[in-house]
């Protein structure tokens, strides 16, 4: 195992700004931290969308999330992860969701398990300012220490095992 900073392992970025007046009631899903929390809790929230034209313009500038990328909440309940499940068009709210691009060095399920761990939650508390609204910034994500197996095969095994365990616990609740 080795300790690395997350920013040493992959590209970490945020989407381009989308103004509220550009939101639509249908079109390309526009994810915010509330959508990640709803997915985690198995609940529904009021969804937001952007037009296909705006999506194409913004994704040409900054890219768009792809299957296996990990989104982590930067505002609200900071540090909550979401794995992009497929390559359907999706765009995210800048700074509200930090975008961690998938690559060959880190398994998304392992990374998800890390973000859900008590070690990470303790780290988030240590860098948050008491008495202010909590934020987890791109720079903080890049500096986040991650203890991880050197082998991607081992990461995948751990990530899959912990994911299966979470599913089993959820099933029996």
What are the language-model segments listed below?
Residues 1-15:
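Non-catalytic DNA-recognition/assembly elements of restriction-modification systems
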Residues 1-2, 140, 144, 151-173:
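Amphipathic alpha-helical segments with low aromatic content
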Residues 19, 42-45, 171-173:
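Short, tandemly repeated low-complexity microdomains enriched for cysteine and small residues
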Residues 23-24:
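Short, glycine-/polar-rich solvent-exposed loops and beta-turns at beta-strand/coil boundaries
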Residues 32-34, 44, 49-120:
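A short beta-sheet element
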Residues 39-43, 135-137:
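Short acidic/His/Gly/Ser-rich catalytic and metal-binding motifs that mark active-site loops
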Residues 74, 90-98, 129-154:
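A short glycine-rich beta-alpha junction/loop motif
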């Amino acid at each position: 195992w080795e300790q690395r900073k997350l920013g040493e392992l992959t590209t970490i970025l945020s989407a381009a700004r989308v103004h509220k007046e550009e939101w639509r009631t249908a079109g390309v899903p526009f994810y915010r931290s509330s959508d990640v929390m709803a997915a985690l809790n198995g609940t529904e929230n009021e969804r937001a969308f952007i037009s296909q034209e705006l999506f194409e313009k913004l994704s040409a500038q900054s890219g768009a999330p792809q299957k296996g990328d990990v989104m982590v909440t930067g505002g609200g309940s900071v540090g909550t992860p979401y794995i992009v499940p497929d390559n359907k068009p999706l765009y995210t709210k800048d700074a509200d969701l930090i975008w961690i691009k998938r690559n060959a060095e880190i398994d998304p399920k392992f990374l998800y398990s890390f973000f859900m761990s008590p070690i990470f939650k303790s780290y988030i508390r240590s860098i948050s300012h008491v008495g202010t609204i909590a934020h987890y910034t791109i720079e903080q994500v890049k500096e986040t220490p991650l203890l991880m197996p050197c082998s991607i095969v081992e990461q995948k095994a751990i990530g899959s095992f912990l994911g299966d365990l979470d599913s089993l616990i959820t099933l029996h609740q």
